[in-house]
Structure formats: C-alpha cells, structure tokens
Amino acid sequence: MKFFVFFVLLFSIDLKSHEFNPAHLVVDQLDSEKFIYEANWMYPFKNIGKRGEIIFPDECKTESSDLYYQGKYINEKIYLDCTKSLKGLYIEVINLSVLTDALITVNFADDDTFEGIVNNKNSIIKIPIKENYLPTAYIFLGLDHLLNGF
C-alpha cells in the first residue's frame, strides 16, 4: 500500500520543467601553422525568436555553408581564414533568447582547448591566450539551470 501511495504522490506532482537544450559553437583549428578554422554552429530549432548568429573577429574572413537540420538543431558550417590566432580575440553571439545559452568550444591544433558560455546578457566572450585546462562550462551551465529553475 505504501508503494502505491508513493507512486500516486510522485506522479501527481505538477513539475514545471522544460528541456535543457543550449546552443553550441564548436571551432576546430585545421592546421597548427595556419589560422584556418572550421566551425559548427548548432542552434536549437524549437526556440523563441530569431536564430542566434555568430560574430567572429574582424581578423577572420568567414564563409558559411547552407543550413541543415540534424536532430534538434539547425546546423551551420562556417569556415574561417584568420590573419592571426583566435587566442586573445573575441567572439560574439547575437539574438540569443532568454531561455537559450550558448556553449562555445575552441579546439586549437596544438591541443589547447577553450570552453565558455554566452547568453543574452553577456553575449561577448574573450578567448584567453592560455589554455583552459578543465572544460567545465557545460557542467556549470547545467547546475545553474537546475538551481535557478530556468
């Protein structure tokens, strides 16, 4: 009987939750001696408002391929040809909705990795010159989401 009451109470609770589905930008340096990068911008298509857009540094020429759907995301491949490394430069994400944060991952050819988070309040992020050894941004984003309720 206690088991039955437990399940009735458990499933009668009205939970106010939504899917945690952040946007994700993954930038990979293709050559350790050249500043050529390939980026994949993954933005959830079930989102409120405009699709978020990436603003890369002025030091980079960009070329984008056509958008395509994969799973829950609209994907965009972006090719960057930069005059110098992305280290020390800024990336901006515009048009993020209140419910969508963006995880940014930059993988350099020398095995350095940077991870950071942007949102609609803090839309610009600086890629540090020194590497980020612990890629914890996604973990902290999830914890913040759980603890703050959005």
Question: Can you describe what each PLM-predicted range is?
Answer:
Residues 2-13:
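Sec-dependent N-terminal signal peptides
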